């Protein structure tokens, strides 16, 4: 059953349904509404109105995203990249990452312990494997090097 988004009311209702599930950024919401067949002019009008009413907020979306992604083991570089791909401004992303109150070193250690059971690499191959995984997850090489050398562990 396909919903036809040919009226402003239908576009608004669909946008509100999406926002009821979780926060969305404007670019992401626009993309989803276009995929459902809504006209660009109606999308802009509906989203402008939702923004005026406080139902669509980039700041809330940033805060929500930055609070839940680290719990999945992702670091600041990966989160920054994902938010950039979703059309958010780099300055806003950097501000949200600074103000989130997350200890990225602790997050790195938690992610490493979950994946590698807290075992430091015994050879270059294992060190490279652990480093690649943590780098892909969005942690800086400086932080990873300190961790894998055993300098930051508080066991």
Curated annotation (Swiss-Prot):
Pfam families tied to this protein: RecX_HTH1 (PF21982), RecX_HTH2 (PF02631), RecX_HTH3 (PF21981)
Coiled coil: none
GO cellular component: cytoplasm
Entries under InterPro entries matching the protein: RecX_HTH_1st, RecX_HTH_2nd, RecX_HTH_3rd, Regulatory_RecX, WH-like_DNA-bd_sf
Principal localisation: cytoplasm
Subcellular locations according to the entry: Cytoplasm
Keywords assigned by UniProt, alphabetized: Cytoplasm
GO biological process: regulation of DNA repair
Its job: Modulates RecA activity.
Family listed: Belongs to the RecX family.
NCBIfam families in UniProt: PRK00117.2-1
Protein name: Regulatory protein RecX
The species this protein was found in: Pseudomonas tolaasii
């Amino acid at each position: 059953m396909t919903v036809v988004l040919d009226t402003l009311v239908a576009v608004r209702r669909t946008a509100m349904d999406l926002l009821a599930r979780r926060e969305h950024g404007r670019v992401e919401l626009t993309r989803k509404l276009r995929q459902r067949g809504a006209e660009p002019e109606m999308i802009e009008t509906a989203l402008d109105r939702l923004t005026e009413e406080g139902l669509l907020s980039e700041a809330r979306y940033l805060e929500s995203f930055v609070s839940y992604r680290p719990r999945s083991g992702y670091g600041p570089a990966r989160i920054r990249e994902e938010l950039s791909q979703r059309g958010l401004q780099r300055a806003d992303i950097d501000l949200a990452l600074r103000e989130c109150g997350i200890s990225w070193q602790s997050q790195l250690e938690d992610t490493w312990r979950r994946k590698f059971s807290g075992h430091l690499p015994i050879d270059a191959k294992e060190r490279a494997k652990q480093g690649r995984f943590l780098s892909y997850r969005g942690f800086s090489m400086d932080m990873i090097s300190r961790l894998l050398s055993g300098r930051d562990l508080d066991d």
